[in-house]
Structure formats: structure tokens, C-alpha cells
Amino acid sequence: MLRSLHSSSSSDTDNNSGGCKNNGGGGGEAAAAVEGGGDQRAVAAAAPSTRDLLLACADLLQRGDLPAARRAAEIVLAAAASPRGDAADRLAYHFARALALRVDAKAGHGHVVVGGGAARPASSGAYLAFNQIAPFLRFAHLTANQAILEAVDGARRVHILDLDAVHGVQWPPLLQAIAERADPALGPPEVRVTGAGADRDTLLRTGNRLRAFARSIHLPFHFTPLLLSCATTAPHHVAGTSTGAAAAASTAAAATGLEFHPDETLAVNCVMFLHNLAGHDELAAFLKWVKAMSPAVVTIAEREAGGGGGGGDHIDDLPRRVGVAMDHYSAVFEALEATVPPGSRERLAVEQEVLGREIEAAVGPSGGRWWRGIERWGGAARAAGFAARPLSAFAVSQARLLLRLHYPSEGYLVQEARGACFLGWQTRPLLSVSAWQPSSS
């Protein structure tokens, strides 16, 4: 069994900010052993931990020593053997594989695995399995839905702009709640969802499923697919040539197919979306573009770095970023280990198609922006003219009830802080959900 990838304390990750050589000697010794060109037995004799070897690989990759970086990744892959061991083995396998893919791409021996900062999309089966066996997506959807439900209460026409609609699993519970709260004298309100995504066929299937569900509960409903260009996360009706902050800052009229009506109450949903935006300028431009729509509420759900991400807009130092990512995903894999039966095919699919691909993106060329955390999202939202919309006590109690009913492990924890609701494993926050509205000032 491989030695744990989790740092012994939050300071361990901070000590990696200058590369592996500052990792208490362990990462530097591992890098030196691998860089020296010794065989695997010589490296093993130095007894570096798996974490040290992965940090060494990142350090060597960053410094351009691709052969040594490849050797470090191969040592971990040989020890982990497959993604079917215990949590530490499986996590080591995915990080070593992600780093090896990046080495190969940089050396010109492979292709770039991911474009931009987005993870390759998982199959619908793996995505839905993740939604069932782990609480992260359901927690984000439930908490965001409650904030939206409260913000649109009493509206006769509701428009939801979902920037990452995927399979639309977030919306049936909200549509049901809206229908049940309808005034009997007036009937249910009209609901329109504009669902954004990069795959036209997936969006069309999502729209068909949501229309069928809305018909079953007698809710007036419309779904409009909105394609995102593969080159940018700015909305387009058809993937075009606009890129970066300029496209994100474009007006709603310029985003063909994105229509707004003055009598609609608008909610903008950004669940696992903002990390796809390239940098501070594009994030700021996107949020200003959203504010120009005058939404009643904007919901944001993103990963948390657990204190290891620092205050910067990116984590450009690759060893430090790998350390932060290992701490985060170590907790995620431990949670799955504790709550999903051993040998579960669903867990294997989730770890390979969802988490493994997230790890590829997180350590990829654009992955540094994944770890901004609530401080960065919140600061950018305030700078764009938004104010926090506190989550209600009922929203938080619903999140806790979700865990008690469906994920009863004592390891999961829901906390309120800084105007957001956090889901964590043990003491490490892994995901935050917050709600925002245009400030009155």
C-alpha cells in the first residue's frame, strides 16, 4: 500500500510554495534521486513518500526536466499498479497518470488532454453515479435551488440561466417545488430554463427530459439550449470566434439566442462553472455581464482549497498546486472509501471518469485557477457590484437533512461561514455554495 498523499497539516502545503525543495527535504531528496537518473531501486532506497514523488514530478516538470519527471511518475504508477487499490493507491494512480500525460504533452509525445481549465466531460452514467454515491453535487443543487426558490417567490414568470446545465438533474426538484407553491387561484408560474453547455446533443436531451417532467406536473415550461464555444466559456448560440474576457463581457443581445423579457424574474446559476474562466479580468468581465442582466439572485458553487489555496488569483507554482489538489482529492477519495462499498463499479466509474478527469484538469496548464475559493469568488462578486444574499436557515437545515438521510457517515460536515454554506469531510471544507444579488449602492 502506498503511503498517504494527504499532508500532515495545512502548513505542509504552504511549505511547497517554492517547489519540492522546500518540502522539509523529502520532496527535494526525491527530486534529486529521480533527477540523478538512478533506477527505481535507488530511488526506493531513499524512501520518499508517494506525496514526495508526486511533488518531485511536478517540480521537475516545472523546471523542464521531462525525462526525470516521467521517471518519477512511472515509479508511482508502478507502485500503484491500477486504480483499484485502497484510497491512497487510487489517488496516487490518478495524480501520477495526470502528471505523466502532461509530461508527454509537453514533450510532444501526446496530445493535450484538456482544453482551457475544464475537465473532459464524463459519461452520463458516471455523472449520474457521482450524483448518487457522493453528496457534493446534490448538496450544491439543493442549496442553490433553495436560494433560487426564495428569490423568485411570487413571480409569475421565472427565467433560470444555468451556465453548466449538463444533464439537468438540478432542476426537477426546483420545478416541483415551484409547482407546489403556486397560488391555486392563479395557477403555477411560467418557468423558462436557458441551459448552457458545450455539447448540443446533450443539451437537446436535457431539454426533452425537463419538458416531459414539467408536463407531468402541469407546469408551463420552456427550455432553450445555449452552446458554449469549446474555445471559451462565454455564451454563444453557436460556437463562434469570440474568446476570453471580451466575449464574457459582451451584452446579452450579442449572445445570440440568449433572450430576456422585462417581466421575468431572472436567476443565474453558476454551479461548478466559474473556475473555467481564465483569470481575474475574465472573471470580473463575466460577473459584470451577469450584473447587467439585473438578476434577482446568482448562485455560485465551487471547490474549496481548504486554506491551502492562498490569496492569489491562480496557483501558478505547479508543486504547490499539486499539493493543494492532493489534499482536496485525498479527502474526497477518503469520503468515498468510507461511504461506498469496496469493489463498487459505480465508485470506479466515478473515480475514473469524473474525479480522474478533474485531477487531469487541475494539474493541467490552466488548472491553477481551480483553487480560488470563496474569498476570491466573493471578492470578485463584490467588485462587480454584487452583495451577498445570506442563505436562509431552512436552506442550511435542508443541506444537513440531505446528509442525514442519504449520506449518514459521521465524516461529512455542513458549516456556515462568510455568508456561504460549506460541505466538508472531517475538518476539510471541499465545496462552498453562496448566493448573491445586485447591491443597492
From Swiss-Prot:
Tissue specificity of this protein: Expressed in a small number of epidermal or subepidermal cells at the leaf axils, in axillary meristems and the entire tiller buds. Undetected in the shoot apical meristem.
Transmembrane segments: none
Keywords, sorted A to Z: Developmental protein, Nucleus, Transcription, Transcription regulation
Chain ranges for the short sequence motif VHIID as given in the UniProt record: 158-162
Short name of one Pfam family: GRAS
Residue ranges, annotated region (Leucine repeat I (LRI)): 48-126
Location of region: Leucine repeat II (LRII): 205-256
Disulphide bond pairs: none
Biased composition regions of type Low complexity, renumbered to the chain: 7-20
Record-level GO cellular component terms: nucleus
PROSITE patterns named among the record's database cross-references: GRAS (PS50985)
Primary localization class, coarse: nucleus
Residue stretches of biased makeup (Gly residues): 21-33
Record family assignment: Belongs to the GRAS family.
Main function: Putative transcription regulator that controls rice tillering by initiating axillary buds and promoting their outgrowth. Rice tiller is a specialized grain-bearing branch that is formed on the unelongated basal internode and grows independently of the mother stem (culm) by means of its own adventitious roots.
Name listed for the protein in its UniProt record: Protein MONOCULM 1
Lineage, uppermost ranks: Eukaryota, Viridiplantae, Streptophyta, Embryophyta, Tracheophyta
Gene of this entry: MOC1
